């Protein structure tokens, strides 16, 4: 009987953990596919917590062989982005660090991330995160943009 209770508890905990995980990040509208040579992103970080987001984004995109360049957060509006060689602009807006405890650790944030297609100038992702771990968000973001790469 104790074994059955432990197994039932393990299944309930597994479902509880799985239900707390966020789904994939979806693109808004249609976006033209890219080839491997266009795997370049330009990133603008809001100065507060930029180090954490930079580290996680470089890891998530670096593993997938994306080239990453940075631009100052306040320079985005003044720069002619059409002349840049990157394909996408990722803007990590001001993030609020959450005091959230989890079994796995991690740093949790709430805020907004926008992604623009620099070929068209259109916003393709507007992701409002709420108490999510930064590495999970950057990994899902890399997967969403990686889905546009043709083989």
Language-model-detected regions and their locations in the chain:
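Short secondary-structure boundary motifs at beta->alpha junctions and helix caps
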Residues: 117-151
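Residues embedded in well-ordered secondary-structure elements
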Residues: 9, 32, 102-104
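Solvent-exposed, acidic/flexible segments
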Residues: 50-54, 104-106, 130-138
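Surface-exposed short loop/turn segments
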Residues: 63-64, 73-131
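A structural "domain/chain start" motif
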Residues: 3, 18-70
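Bacterial N-terminal signal peptides
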Residues: 10-18
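Bacterial N-terminal signal peptides that target proteins for export
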Residues: 1-8
